[in-house]
Curated annotation (Swiss-Prot):
Gene3D superfamilies with a match to the protein in the record: 3.30.1440.10
Cellular component GO terms held in the UniProt record: cytosolic large ribosomal subunit
PANTHER family cross-referenced by the UniProt entry: 60S RIBOSOMAL PROTEIN L11-RELATED
Quaternary structure (record): Part of the 50S ribosomal subunit; contacts the 5S rRNA and probably tRNA. Forms a bridge to the 30S subunit in the 70S ribosome.
Assigned protein family: Belongs to the universal ribosomal protein uL5 family.
Cross-referenced NCBIfam families: PRK04219.1 (NF003258)
Protein name: Large ribosomal subunit protein uL5
A Gene Ontology biological process term: translation
InterPro entries: Ribosomal_uL5 (IPR002132), Ribosomal_uL5_arc (IPR022804), Ribosomal_uL5_C (IPR031309), Ribosomal_uL5_dom_sf (IPR022803), Ribosomal_uL5_N (IPR031310)
Assigned keywords, A-Z: Ribonucleoprotein, Ribosomal protein, RNA-binding, rRNA-binding, tRNA-binding
Ribonucleoprotein listed as a keyword: yes
GO molecular function: RNA binding; rRNA binding; structural constituent of ribosome; tRNA binding
A Pfam entry, by short name: Ribosomal_L5_C
Length: 182
């Protein structure tokens, strides 16, 4: 039986423990289909430079006039340099301030923007109108692929998951984000 050597690197220097930006998801939920949905699609494509997908309702809600399977919103997922670039734009628009309550226990951050016109480079177009959007930031470490792969899928151990505090530290160090109570 071969005994493995203990790691001599502290946790902060271990490359597998380094937190990284996995993806940024931008969602515009309208709750209706039609012309306004097409305008939201066009706007999201202009702002992100990526092709959005339509979100579909899961159930019928008569009071809102929504049927199951109806397209009711648009979203786009950004990864890599594109995600980082868009995230910097969004953080600049909100003044690099995030509420501590925006973070969940698994290192994800979600917040909203009331009007898209506050984003740098975005202009108001009376034909399109003004849309609000939700932004979700997903952080992960190297090795998270084991939870998504097809064969030999496994859970991420608790000690390897990104915590709320690590997510806050990552955004503070890499994006100069100030955390406010709330």
């Amino acid at each position: 039986m071969i005994k493995m050597a203990e790691s001599t690197l502290p946790l902060s220097q271990n490359p597998m423990r380094k937190v990284k930006l996995s993806k940024v998801t931008v969602n515009i939920g309208l709750g209706e289909s039609g012309d306004r949905l097409q305008k939201a699609y066009q706007l999201l494509q202009e702002l992100t430079g990526a092709k959005p997908v339509y979100t579909i309702s899961k159930k019928t809600i008569r009071e809102f006039g929504i049927r199951k399977g109806q397209e009711i919103g648009v979203k786009v997922t950004l990864r890599g340099a594109q995600a980082e670039e868009f995230l910097r734009k969004v953080l600049e628009a909100i003044g690099y301030r995030l509420k501590k309550s925006s973070f969940d226990d698994y290192g994800n951050v979600s917040f909203g923007i009331a009007e898209h016109v506050i984003l740098p480079g975005a202009r108001y177009d009376p034909e399109i109108g003004i849309f609000g959007m939700d932004i979700a930031i997903t952080l992960e470490r190297a090795g998270y692929r084991i939870s998504r792969r097809r064969r030999k899928k496994a859970k991420i151990p608790k000690r390897h998951r990104v915590t709320k505090e690590e997510a806050m530290e990552f955004l503070r160090n890499n994006f100069n984000v100030q955390l406010v109570e709330g």
